[in-house]
Design a protein with these regions (language model features):
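Non-heme di-metal
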Residues: 1-225
Length: 225
């Protein structure tokens, strides 16, 4: 518990300094600076990240030899897959959100990930698969926390712009709660090894998570302008 508290102080400080909720993408969205087509394109690009996220978890699990440390991640992966209910698979709930803001099934099917999103997906896969699991795991913890922090903002903006009913916003209402839980579960696993030389590796992983995800938001913003 002591190491977890110490690690949480590091992540809390990081989020105080970076203030991801004030990223220019969310400021511009909140200020209504985008056309409907631009909003839809940004939402579609995030879809390609949501679609890919379970593969990051799968990649990192291959590098973890201790089943006890794998268990929280397996549960996370189980929830990503809707606890085996296809209706609640996270990529499917996100598709419901897309439809709620006026994106058609045809537009979803024809959408392609942009170069920034491909770079993000490949970069994180590489980190999770080919480097020490503590580094990748720390990055995923930060990413889960970022999503938990921005989900209420996105949900509120969607309600304001589209009057979306709660049903189509389930992806974001779920992630407000689930991703806080997932982030803390990941931090708890990482904290078990937060000592000695591994501290530096873990802190580098935290920074990677913040860098990759905030950079992805920046690149998506630049792409639609």
């Amino acid at each position: 518990m002591e190491k977890f508290v110490e690690l949480k102080k590091v992540t809390d400080r990081m989020f105080q300094e970076k203030k991801i909720e004030q990223h220019p993408l969310f400021v511009a969205l909140n200020n209504g600076e985008f056309s409907e087509e631009q909003r839809k394109e940004m939402a579609l690009q995030i879809y390609h990240v949501v679609l890919y996220f379970p593969r990051f978890l799968s990649a990192i699990l291959t590098n973890m030899s201790d089943y006890r440390m794998r268990m929280p991640l397996v549960e996370n992966l189980f929830e990503e897959h809707g606890k085996m209910n296809e209706k609640y698979v996270h990529s499917e709930t996100y598709k419901e959100f897309l439809k709620g803001i006026g994106v058609s099934e045809k537009e979803i099917m024809e959408s392609e990930p942009s170069i920034p999103v491909i770079a993000y997906n490949r970069g994180l896969t590489d980190l999770c698969l080919h480097y020490h699991y503590l580094e990748g795991l720390a990055a995923l913890g930060v990413i889960e926390e970022i999503v938990a922090r921005v989900s209420p903002l996105v949900g509120q903006i969607a309600k304001s712009n589209y009057g979306s009913e709660n049903k189509s916003l389930i992806h974001f209402t779920d992630h407000e709660v689930l991703d806080v839980q997932h982030a803390n579960e990941i931090y708890e696993v990482v904290a078990l090894n937060y000592e000695g030389d591994q501290k530096q590796m873990i802190e580098r992983g935290l920074q990677f998570g913040m860098y990759y995800h905030s950079r992805m938001y920046t690149d998506i913003l630049e792409n639609v302008h």
